[in-house]
Amino acid sequence: MKKKVVLVQDNKEILDIMDQVLEEEGFDVTASLTTAPIEKIDEIEPDVVVVDDHIKGSKRGSEVIKELKSDPQTETVSAVLTSTSSSLPRQAEDCKADDYIEKPFDIDHMIDVVKKNA
């Protein structure tokens, strides 16, 4: 069975590239520029969520991950934070993310991080 990934990014081009690459790697991907898939996490049941810290909406990606990790229903879903911020490692640790991907990222590194956490 395919591993499920939810991608939430702030940039459509990056979202499309990540979506295409991960689907080619055999993942079942739900990709969005909004947090809509996170709100349906019980239906999607992803193995990993990859969320950009600067997503559109009222919350930052780190806040979304922190909420997922503090909810007993979703705390076991792996979460990866992405950002261009130099403080990304600390942000990821603070929100209890399982991993992080610094932007701009190397495609192979992104694949490795998602595979490791899925």
Functional labels for PLM-detected ranges:
Residues 105-114:
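C-terminal output helix
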Residues 31-48, 56:
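Acidic, metal-coordinating helix/loop segments flanking the phosphotransfer/catalytic sites
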Residues 63, 85-102:
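Alpha4 helix (beta4-alpha4-beta5 surface) of REC/receiver domains from two-component response regulators
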Residues 41, 50, 64-65, 74:
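Hydrophobic alpha-helical motif in two-component signaling modules
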Residues 11-30:
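Two-component/phosphorelay signaling modules centered on CheY-like receiver
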Residues 9, 83:
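Conserved acidic carboxylate
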Residues 47, 72-78:
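His-Asp phosphorelay/catalytic-motif detector in bacterial-type signaling
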Residues 51-68:
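Conserved phosphotransfer microenvironments
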